């Protein structure tokens, strides 16, 4: 039987590998956890953990079905894993568009709205995986674009 410490380590590593890697099957998760030193892990335990933490299968940017944990609630910060959800940042003369992983747009738009006018963002409109950003000033759109890119460590 695992001790509380081992259980805490298992939960921490389980969440970490689901956030950092892309797994299409429960057996892939079992193999990854076994590689981390949890030799007694099996598919049924992984299945229970996926349910317990609300993990779902969704399509990633490559259109592959993968397991993902839901975004954590609370006030998001730029240092949180949200930056990993930004897939593309582009603009024209009047608007900035951010493309995200499916389901992440509203959470990222909330962060952008929270930094608001001081950083050149008048407002946002978010769908499931796309955010339209209206800059405070069209003349300063390049600065606002760079602010957004640096916020999410986005490089083209």
UniProtKB/Swiss-Prot annotation:
Cellular component annotations (GO), alphabetically ordered: cytoplasm
Location in the cell: Cytoplasm
UniProt entry tagged with the keyword Transcription regulation: yes
Keywords assigned: Amino-acid biosynthesis, Arginine biosynthesis, Cytoplasm, DNA-binding, Repressor, Transcription, Transcription regulation
Listed Pfam families: Arg_repressor (PF01316), Arg_repressor_C (PF02863)
Entry's family note: Belongs to the ArgR family.
Protein name: Arginine repressor
Species for this entry: Shewanella baltica (strain OS155 / ATCC BAA-1091)
Native organism taxonomy: Bacteria, Pseudomonadati, Pseudomonadota, Gammaproteobacteria, Alteromonadales
Protein encoded by which gene: argR
